[in-house]
Amino acid sequence: MRLLNRVCMLPFCVPYELAWKFYLSRQQPAWHLIVPGLWLGRRVQASELPKGVGLVIDVTAEFEGFRAIRDNYTYWTLPTLDARTATKQSFKALSERIAKWSESGIYIHCAKGRGRSTTLLVAVLMERGQVQTIDEAMELIRGQRPQVRLHKPQREVLESLYEHHLA
């Protein structure tokens, strides 16, 4: 069945993989340290991960995680399409789980490290109490990784989860 899934997804995955390789050729930093022990970035090979990372969070739906990462790191995934979020319940559960992690550094990524991973990082920062508002989180993140952004559905899920933080 896995082979059949790959064959069916081929028309989507090949162009996406090529676009991803083009993006890599633009020489932007793969990741940025946002707060101590918490990195945000794009999809990387195991050799590109920052030192100190033990937990890798993958929020891509279009790529399978690299085997070297899946086999050598704690690896959690929440498959999410670009410019979207997962279900509110699964998103909240994962952000709470990440916020409680204290064993090692955490690397959160999507394909380019701009939207889906940023949405999850905002939630983690809110869960940890490191920021009080979505805008404060975005300012903190943009201070390190300027290319981040939230699409409307991503911001909406954050607002619905953290409405008690909104002024």
Across the structure, where does each feature detected by a protein language model lie?
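Short cysteine clusters
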Residues: 110
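Conserved SAM/SAH-binding loop-helix junction
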Residues: 116
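Cysteine-based protein phosphatase catalytic domain of the PTP/DSP
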Residues: 18-107, 123-162, 166
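Hydrophobic positions on the alpha1 helix immediately C-terminal to the Walker A/P-loop
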Residues: 119-120
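Conserved G/P- and acidic residue-centered "switch" motifs that form tight phosphate/ATP-binding loops
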Residues: 113
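N-terminal membrane-anchoring alpha-helices
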Residues: 1-25
